[in-house]
Amino acid sequence: MAGDKEIRNKIASVKNTQKITGAMEMVAASKMRRAQLRMNSSLSYAKSMRKVIGHIALGELEYHHAYLEEREISRVGYIVISSDRGLCGGLNINLFKPLVAAMKKHSEANVEVDLAVIGSKAATFFNGLGANVVAQNSGLGDAPSVNDLIGSVKIMLDAYDEGKIDRLFIVNNKFISTMVQEPTISQLLPLPKAEGDKEVASDSWDYIYEGEAKDILDSLLVRYVESQVYQGVVENLACEQVSRMIAMKSATDNAGDMIDELQLVANKARQSAITQELSEICSGAAAV
C-alpha cells in the first residue's frame, strides 16, 4: 500500500486538475450560449434568403442558373467543418466517419473527391489520410465572420463554375440540443428544391427589385452558399462548446470519484498505521 504522504500528494494533484476542468466547463458553457445566439441569427437570415431565391428562380423560368441545374457527376466537392481544438469528446471523429464512408463509395463509382477543410482537426485528419485537400482554413476563433470563410468558399465555387466539380456538399455537426449533436452531410450545389418554393411563388410578394432578376439571382446564390457555410461554422462551434462542456463535466465528476477513492485508501493506511502502533505498545507493555 502507498504511504500516507504519497496518497495525499495524489489527492492534491487530482484536486488541482478538478479545479481546472471545472473552470473549463464554465467557460465552455458561456461560449456555447454566445455561439447559439450567432447560430440562431444566421439561421433566420439564411431562411429569408432562401425564400427570395426560390421566388426569383421560379419567376424567371427562362433563366437557368448553373447552381440550380443538375449535371452528370464525375467529381464532387466537400466543405468540411471541424474544430481547431480538442477536449470535445468524439465530436470530430464522429463527423469524419460518414464522410470517409461517402468518399469510399465515390471511389468505387470512379467519382473523384476534392475537400476544402475548415478547422485544424479536419486538416490534420484528411491530409494524413492522403485526401485531395484543395483549400484549408483554421484559427477562426470563437467569433468567426463570413469574411474569414470567403476564400475557401470561392475556391469551391470557382471549381463548380469551371465544371471541375459537379456537386458540392457541406459537412458539419448539427446542433439539435445540448444533449444531441448530429453529424450531417448536406448538398449545397446544385441548390436542392425547398419544400416551400411553390408556396412562395404563389403567395403575394411585397418586394420590388432594383435591377434585372438574373443579376440579383447571380449575386444571391453566391451569398446564400457563403451564408450556409457560415451557418455550418457557427453551428459546429456551438456543438464543439457543448461537447467540451460535457467532457469537462465528466472529467470533473471523475476527479471527484477518484478523490473519494484516494481518501478511502488514505484512511485505511492511517488506520493500519495506528493499529500497528497500538500493537507495538501493547507488546512492549506485556514484555515489561
From Swiss-Prot:
Produces ATP from ADP in the presence of a proton gradient across the membrane. The gamma chain is believed to be important in regulating ATPase activity and the flow of protons through the CF(0) complex. It is found in: Cell inner membrane. CDD domains: F1-ATPase_gamma. It is a peripheral membrane protein. InterPro entries: ATP_synth_F1_ATPase_gsu (IPR035968), ATP_synth_F1_gsu (IPR000131), ATP_synth_F1_gsu_CS (IPR023632). This is ATP synthase gamma chain. Its main location: membrane. One of its GO terms (molecular function) is proton-transporting ATP synthase activity, rotational mechanism. It comes from Psychromonas ingrahamii (strain DSM 17664 / CCUG 51855 / 37). Disulfide bonds: none annotated. One of its GO terms (biological process) is proton motive force-driven plasma membrane ATP synthesis. Coiled coil: none annotated. Belongs to the ATPase gamma chain family. PANTHER family: ATP SYNTHASE GAMMA CHAIN, ATP SYNTHASE SUBUNIT GAMMA, MITOCHONDRIAL. GO terms for cellular component: plasma membrane; proton-transporting ATP synthase complex. Keywords: ATP synthesis, Cell inner membrane, Cell membrane, CF(1), Hydrogen ion transport, Ion transport, Membrane, Transport. F-type ATPases have 2 components, CF(1) - the catalytic core - and CF(0) - the membrane proton channel. CF(1) has five subunits: alpha(3), beta(3), gamma(1), delta(1), epsilon(1). CF(0) has three main subunits: a, b and c.
